[in-house]
Amino acid sequence: MATTMLNQDKMQMFVERYLELSNELKYRKGESGAYLQLGEILTQKGDYDTSTKHFYRAMKIAEETGDGDLKEHAKVNFGMANASMKWTNHVSNIL
């Protein structure tokens, strides 16, 4: 488990750097892909609130750039992360 978290942390660091570079270069498709990857990493970590924000950003940028596949991928992940967040909150309230 500790190794998995360490790998996720490293991956997050690399993707955040990729996002910075994409922003500097104004590479919008790179930005949307980075937001999608960050959302997936944060979902795995259980940070559903932040992951849904990243998926939303990925969706919006993909829409602007005409990347329909990435937009749909981000939309599905947004829905799954949102449902997981609601389920986690529901279970916490019960317990």
Enumerate the predicted regions with their spans.
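Residue register within tetratricopeptide repeats
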Residues: 9-12, 29, 49, 89
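Tetratricopeptide repeat
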Residues: 11-18, 51, 57-58
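Residue register of alpha-helical TPR repeats
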Residues: 13, 33, 53, 73-75
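Extended alpha-helical assembly domains of large eukaryotic scaffold proteins
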Residues: 1-8, 16-21
